[in-house]
Amino acid sequence: MSDVFDAKAFLKTVTSQPGVYRMYDAGGTVIYVGKAKDLKKRLSSYFRSNLASRKTEALVALIAQIDVTVTHTETEALLLEHNYIKLYQPRYNVLLRDDKSYPFIFLSGDTHPRLAMHRGAKHAKGEYFGPFPNGYAVRETLALLQKIFPVRQCENSVYRNRSRPCLQYQIGRCLGPCVAGLVSEEEYAQQVEYVRLFLAGKDDQVLTQLIARMEKASQSLEFEEAARIRDQIQAVRRVTEKQFVSNTGDDLDVIGVAFEAGMACVHVLFIRQGKVLGSRSYFPKVPGGTELGEVVETFVGQFYLQGSQMRTLPGEILLDFSLGDKTLLAESLSELAGRRINVQTKPRGDRARYLKLARTNAATALTTKLAQQSTIHQRLQALATVLELPAVKRMECFDISHTMGEQTVASCVVFDSNGPLRAEYRRYNITGITPGDDYAAMNQVLRRRYGKAIDENKIPDVILIDGGKGQLAQAKAVFAELDVPWDKHHPLLLGVAKGSDRKAGLETLFFEPEGEGFSLPPDSPALHVIQHIRDESHDHAISGHRKKRAKVKSTSSLETIEGVGPKRRQMLLKYMGGLQGLQQASVEEIAKVPGISHGLAEKIFYSLKH
C-alpha cells in the first residue's frame, strides 16, 4: 500500500451520494470508519488547511488509502457504519468495549412451559422478558420467581425422562408437571399466567387474582390451600414494595453521560413496564481529542445498531445530550424495530427524574473509575521503575490449575495501562502431558499463546510466570525456540514465587532461573500490581478448572462400573435427570432405563450407594 496519499486525485472520483468510508494506514489497517450524507463533501473536509482538531490532524497524517461504499439512504449508511466499526475496531473511532448480547427471561411455549435465562437470537417458540443488565440479575429474578410461582426451570431433556419428582418439587419450588397426577393442568397453567403477568409488570392483576382465590378457598374450608395462597400474596407484595416503579408503565432506556479527563462513562437505565430492571455503566474507548458529542453519538449508534447485539428496542430512549443526528437515529432505530422509536433529549416530569438518576450514576461511576485508574497508573509506573523499563503498557500472567493432575487448565490474564483487560482473558485446556506436570503445562500454554503472529500493540512488555525458578526456566526455553515474525525479545520474563508460608507480601521475583531472586517491600506499589495480576490469573485458572471438573463429575462415578459404557452413562443421566436423580432412584426405577437389565440396575444401585 502506498505511503503517499493523493487526496486531490481521490476526491475527483468520489460521488456526492450517501455512504460509508474506511480509512487505511500504510500497513493496510483500517484506522477510521465514518458515514456521510454527501461523501464528497464530508471527505473533502479532511483535507482542508485548517482542520478542526489535533485528533483529525493525526488521523489524516496516517491515511494511505480510502475506500467508499455508496448506500441508497443515510439510514442504510448509519447501519453499515456501525457494523464496520464492530468488524474493524478502528483506533480513531469511539469503541463500545462491551458488546455482549443482553440476557432475557424466556418462558417457553411447551405444554408445561419452563422458565430459563436466554441470550442471543430469539428462535425458540415462547415469550421473552427483558432485557436485564446482566446474567446475575436474571438468575436472581429466576430464583425469586421459583420461590413465589413454582413453575419448572429444568431442561426439556430432564423433564421428559423423569419417573419421579426431583428435589425442587420436594422443597416446594416446582409443581412437578413431569410426573402425572402431581398437579392439574389448570393449576399449572394458572401459575404460568401469574409468571407472565408478573414479568409484564402487572402485579396488581396478580394480587387481585390471588386474593380472589384465597377467599374462595377459605369459604370452601380449604384452609391449607388458603394459607399457601396467602404466602404467595405476601411474597408478591414484598417484592413489589422494593421496586422503583413508574406510574406510566412505559418501556424506556435512559442514558446519562459523564465526561472528564478524556474518559467517558455512559450509564444506561433499563425500564420495562414501568419497572427499573437494572442499569449498567459503560466506559467506551475514546481516542484523544474526541469531543463529547462524538462520544455520545457513536456510543448510541453502536449500542443499538450493531447487528449481532440482539438488543430489544424500547418504545422511547431518553438522552442526556442533544444529538445533531437525532432524527436520523430515530428513523434508523424505527426501521430496525419495525415500529416507531422516539428519541427524547429534553424530557419533563418523571422522565426528567429518570434522566437525572442516570446522569448521577454516570458521574459516580466515572469518579470511581478515575480513582482506580490513578492507582493502577501509579503502580505500573512504580513497576516500570523497579524493572528498569520505560513503561509497562501491557502485562500478561500465567497460572496452572488441576486436581491431582486431572482436568488441567492454564490461564492467561491481561493488564493494560488501565488495569485488568478482562475481554482478553483466556483459558487453555492442557492435554497430552503427564498428569501433574506443571512444567509441561506451562511449556504448552506458552507455545500456544506466543508461537504465532501477534499484533504489535498486543506484544506484552512483561510476562509474569507464577511458580518461580522452574516455571521461569520453561518460559525462557520456549522463547529461545520461538520462530515468529514479532520481536520475541521485547517481553521481559519475570518469575514470581510465594514464600514458604505462601503469604502475600513474601513473594520472591526472578529475572533468571539461576541465582538469587529479590523481594519488594510489602508496601511497594510495584508489588501490589504484581499481586493483583497474579491473583487474577490464579482465580481465572481455578474457576476454569472447577467448571471442567464439574462437567466430568456427573459421569465420573459411573465410569468405574463394569458394563456401563459411554452410551449407557448418557442414557442413565438423561432418563434420570442427572446424577442426583440417579443416586436417589431405586433398583426398579433404574431397570426401566432403556438398555439396563435388572442385574445391571442392581450393580449400579449398590455401586452408587457404596
UniProtKB/Swiss-Prot annotation:
Keyword Protein biosynthesis: no
SUPFAM superfamilies the UniProt entry points to: C-terminal UvrC-binding domain of UvrB (SSF46600), GIY-YIG endonuclease (SSF82771), RuvA domain 2-like (SSF47781)
Cellular location(s): Cytoplasm
Composition bias type Basic residues, residue spans: 543-552
One of the record's GO molecular function terms: excinuclease ABC activity
GO biological process: nucleotide-excision repair; SOS response
Listed CDD domains: GIY-YIG_UvrC_Cho (cd10434)
Main subcellular location of this protein, as a coarse class: cytoplasm
Keyword terms: Cytoplasm, DNA damage, DNA excision, DNA repair, Excision nuclease, SOS response
PANTHER family per UniProt: UVRABC SYSTEM PROTEIN C (PTHR30562:SF1), UVRC/OXIDOREDUCTASE (PTHR30562)
Family to which this protein belongs: Belongs to the UvrC family.
Quaternary state and interactors: Interacts with UvrB in an incision complex.
Biological role: The UvrABC repair system catalyzes the recognition and processing of DNA lesions. UvrC both incises the 5' and 3' sides of the lesion. The N-terminal half is responsible for the 3' incision and the C-terminal half is responsible for the 5' incision.
Protein name in the entry: UvrABC system protein C
